[in-house]
């Protein structure tokens, strides 16, 4: 029984990898019809530590220095994969000042550059849905003052996330209810996307 479960989980993960790398990221729209707005609450005290170059994660302090989080070797951190669900985005968005916004933008777009093509440990239905929900909730913070190039990159990533979840949320261990993956799909469906209007 255990062996069968291991084999099944292996093929689930393999399927996630293949899907993440092949799913389309072409976004026909660059705007939400309904303004999503933040619905998750962060911790300003944790954001303060991040702005000071320290990440409080799973009971430990991780020294960031001046580097973007994804430039560090994170495998030594227990459950480091959870960072790919972007829990820190809630905290930084709650603080919301210039320093926090700059970190948000650096971390989000460096993640997209490094892992957005479908690589890394973050492409599971659970983590992808958590990440997608937060990316949608904190759109204003992420895109604050950025150019059309970054806006386009953001919406392409949103499209890829939603496309991945729609194909993979049911391909998971039946013992783990993937409620968040379903919520991720609903979030995109609810907010909708429409073609960006140009003058």
Placement of each model-derived feature along the sequence:
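Extracellular glycan-targeting catalytic surfaces
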Residues: 1-173, 179-186
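Single conserved hydrophobic/aromatic residue that forms the stacking wall/gate
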Residues: 192-199
